[in-house]
Amino acid sequence: MKIALVTAVAAFALDEDLRPLQNAMHAAGVDAPIVAWDDMTVSWRRFDAAVLRSTWDYVERLPEFLAWARAVQGQTLLLNPLEVIKNNVDKHYLAKLEAKGIAIVPSAFAEPGEDAA
């Protein structure tokens, strides 16, 4: 089995769980290369699945990221699925969960163009 662990190049060194996850998958007999989501040389069809890990630059590149996810879901099993991705890119979903009584990490929301400080 071959599963892509999908990241952003800038996030590679910041995702502290990425290498341990990859090592655990290798120990379980799964080939799990770490792949940048925007690497246009990647053939996503060669993977049994693509697991989104640390694609953290999607915020600045949302239309491009969603187009990528749409394309990849037609080539392999995308985890999370596109509909989940589209619902989760706007973090206001956390406030909706909290309003329903679900515990969340304390959160503040900065709107586009707002000073987040």
Which residue ranges define each predicted feature?
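Active-site nucleotide/adenylate-binding loops and adjacent lid/helix of ATP-dependent enzymes
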Residues: 1-7, 13, 69-75, 79-117
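Residue-level signal for short, function-critical loop segments
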Residues: 9-10, 56
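A short, Lys/Arg-enriched amphipathic alpha-helix followed by its capping loop at the start of a domain
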Residues: 17-30
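N-terminal glycine-rich "phosphate-gripper" loop used for MgATP/nucleotide binding
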Residues: 30-73, 79-88
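Accessory recognition modules or surfaces
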Residues: 11-12, 47
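Generic recognition of short, well-ordered alpha-helical segments
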Residues: 16-20, 45, 63-64, 92
